[in-house]
């Protein structure tokens, strides 16, 4: 930087785990807040964001370093997103320098230009526009390609979706009928001027009331809970609410919990609205995410359908936020910056003065409480759409029953009946792999992870042992390392083992397994889901990713093989999570005109929770659970912050949290409880010893004040050099 230039102060948020900003010198004109700058930081060069123009600095001017480079002439983040991120950093007690990058695509964080890439387009030439298409009747693909391109230019990927391959395009290019040019795509947001919507399904009375309630308040903030049973037509309500907003040129953010729900949601929205719909999820590459982010920011995209991090995306004219499956735990970030996307979305809508719609068949108890206390509007859908009937529910007592790969003879017989009738069957087992552990039949040795207090999971695919906690992998041993016996057997059942059994028991009915192990590659999940809907597979095996929001009209039998573990968990949220999971899985049965049956296998059929769910449904369970939470002073009737700490030694982390507990208690906030420290459910993970300290109070403000004070105190403790700690505000998992 030229030393002869006049320099002034800029304050920069730096992506490091320090709860402060750093001042630098910059030439005039100063980069605006929201602009990226390249800065020297120790021996590194980092990309930070300007957050302020201070008039003075606590550091003597002579010691301040100049910026290396200003990367933007205009802010990449506007004042609305900057303010939202600053609020988030304060609420979740996390350094702003580490919070701000969550609002930026990876390429922008790295300092790449926040600009569109040029795309290649195929055009029909003058000769191509003039030629008689019948001259190409001997080359059907060339004829199809030219006919399409006469209507307008297309990208190679768009042509590929039309099953037009490059060979046909190259042949037409050689004939002088096509040419390829590079252009920057248009993102001027003119989609509203030629808005077109397809005809929707006819709404029933409840759906129409829900649509009217939201659209009548579309010009101001309002939080709405759409509490609709599975199959009640919540998506049709979303679409009907969006239509007048899109027609007015407003953009929409639609959030889904799982990557797997994105393609089907996009297809549904694209079929209804002839507007640009973009996606944002972790399955996309960095360039795709940047293009989607820019299209939203500049107004070129009408609808963004995204997972958790989409909540931070800037929009030119955002008109509504919709959170589908709002109860889902995937909306909570469980490491680093531990934000809850649903709660942040409500705050974003409030700050922007727009409505937010939270949809679920199994609303979280926090959201239900907000609806019942008047903070949210409560909209109910109690009838299944069309002619769909509510599925019959049965609990199978499997005490003393000989199971094969977790499957009882009774459930196997029911499967045979439904398959013979030409229907599909879905089995739910929330445990991937072949078996949860590997043991020696002779001496009892078990394959334990060396870095965690956990067993290795046996994966038959790849013949490996895999720790699902620290991700370490080792080959499947041929013999017992303790006694040398080759009698190594699995303990417990995973989805691989169930798949193996069913291909033997029902060889004439194709089986598909859907879990994280066989849907890692891009497009794999969409392919499987498409094949299921086309009837290629008759038996579906899946973990919870198959239970979320998918519509399988030919599934008439759903079996849940093993949910007993959740009945006796120490986590006070376990019952709520099980109730939601059961209800969501059960909702996959009988969603069209065919009647459905849900079968729950259990060693504890008399358990009050299972009886309540199968006889009275989720709503009754939620009423009971909220009464219990109120009596016990648990969320949503109190607020929590959870300190987690880990270190190489048990004593280090124990002493650190014990001192923190004493410090918190000495602050004398009489209504705030300090519970612990205690070991996590898994004391050792990835070679680190872990403990936690729970801080809880009936009012949010004093709890936040105490935690804010404690965090500032911790910054000066020498123990933090050996102990890694973090604070989780509103924790959803106490482990």
What residues fall within each predicted segment?
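Long hydrophobic segments that form regular secondary structure
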Residues: 658-660
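Short beta-strand elements
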Residues: 512, 668-680, 721-729
